[in-house]
Amino acid sequence: MIMHKGKTIYLSSVTVDVESARKIVELRNGDVQKKFLNPTKNSIEDQLEWLGNYLERNKNGDEFYFFIKRIDTDEIIGTVRIYDIKRDIDSFCWGSWILNERKTHTAALESYLLINKFAFYHLNYQNSHFDVRKDNSKVISFHKKTGAVITDDDEMNYYFQYT
């Protein structure tokens, strides 16, 4: 199990089990969270099947999925994922970034730093690409402040890149 520790949170690899599937469905279906995520089925069985397929992608080094947990309570407060790895341009996408209302004050910044540290320094990627829903103004502002550049957009999303 991969773990990366910050000041108030840590990242722990998602496991393929019913409890993980249940927690992901719960996190993805919060009123605020689901507004900015791709729609998924609310079924634990469907999520468990998706996690089984994810495990194969993870074994191939094509995807990494983490729970974000509080250090003080070990409570799962979110998720973050690396996927859409483009080896030809040495880039990874990160997303499925969810934090619930029980997050720590610094959980967003810490999880952002930890996922990038993992991808840039552990996996040795040189670039990052990702998309953000246009109506998710807080996250857009966050990424602009951290140096991400908008490279494209469509009706729904802005596409960002770090180089």
What are these regions (language model features)?
Residues 54-67:
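A short helix-loop-beta-strand connector motif used in the catalytic cores of GNAT acetyltransferases and
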Residues 67, 74-84, 93:
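Conserved beta-strand in the GNAT
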Residues 83, 89-101:
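Conserved acetyl-CoA binding element of GNAT-fold acetyltransferases
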Residues 105-118, 141-145:
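Conserved acetyl-CoA-binding loop-helix of GNAT-fold acetyltransferases
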Residues 153-163:
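C-terminal "cap" of GNAT-fold acetyltransferases
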Residues 144-154:
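Conserved acetyl-CoA-binding loop of GNAT-fold acetyltransferases
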Residues 1-48:
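A short, well-structured alpha-helix characteristic of acyl/acetyltransferase catalytic modules
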Residues 129-140:
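Conserved beta-strand-loop-alpha-helix junction that forms the acyl-donor binding cleft
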